[in-house]
Amino acid sequence: MSQLFRFPSAIRRDPRIEAWMRGHAGELGAIAQRWFEVMRSCGDDVRELLHDGHPTACVADAAFAYVNAFRAHVNVGFFRGAEIADPEGLLEGTGRFMRHVKLSPERGVDAAALMNLIETAYTDMKNRLKAE
């Protein structure tokens, strides 16, 4: 049995995500939007949907990353984050599969390292789909 998180309803551009972004204005919304755009730009096979109330990026229908805004921070999360390389040690969390990077206006992040994590998660999911 596959342990991938699959969303057959994922589409190229989900208008609900645009509405979510408009509803999260300010610094935190800008942070979430910036990093979700990086996810969107990973490849032509990226699809998206609103899952559990937050923007989720998929390779075809297999979720690889998400953003979520809270009162004081934004999470950039990875569905198989526990299994991807994190040479800069950005990932937080202790779950079996998922990890996240916590961002805020006051808390700097190594943008190149986070971009690398997103690209790694995307490539990892592509490879998992090929292996199925």
Tell where the protein language model's regions lie, with residue ranges.
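Charge-dense, helix-prone N-terminal extensions
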Residues: 1-132
